[in-house]
Swiss-Prot record:
Keywords: Ribonucleoprotein, Ribosomal protein, RNA-binding, rRNA-binding. The keyword Electron transport does not apply. Part of the 30S ribosomal subunit. Forms a tight heterodimer with protein bS6. GO terms for cellular component: cytosolic small ribosomal subunit. It holds the Pfam family Ribosomal_S18. Belongs to the bacterial ribosomal protein bS18 family. The gene is rpsR. This is Small ribosomal subunit protein bS18. Binds as a heterodimer with protein bS6 to the central domain of the 16S rRNA, where it helps stabilize the platform of the 30S subunit.
Amino acid sequence: MKPRATSSHGYKAQGNKALNGALTSKKKVSKNQVVFFDYRDERKLKRFINDQGKIIPRRITGLSAKEQNLLTHSVKWARFLAVIPYVVDEYK
């Protein structure tokens, strides 16, 4: 079987999204910040919800797995208590 072609740096020719910077500029949270999510803080939670009302994934927000889990629980609890809506009205 013939091996795949590689670039001069040794990476596969097909490329890697992390290497070409496709995902690096979309991060929403700096790694230097201490992240705490309060279900009552509507402004902070809305930063992590897209225009359809979905929670933005980890690969875009730049959160760790633990922080993303805390965010998810806070958003779900805020929706349950009607702090933020389940469905966004602006999306039509």
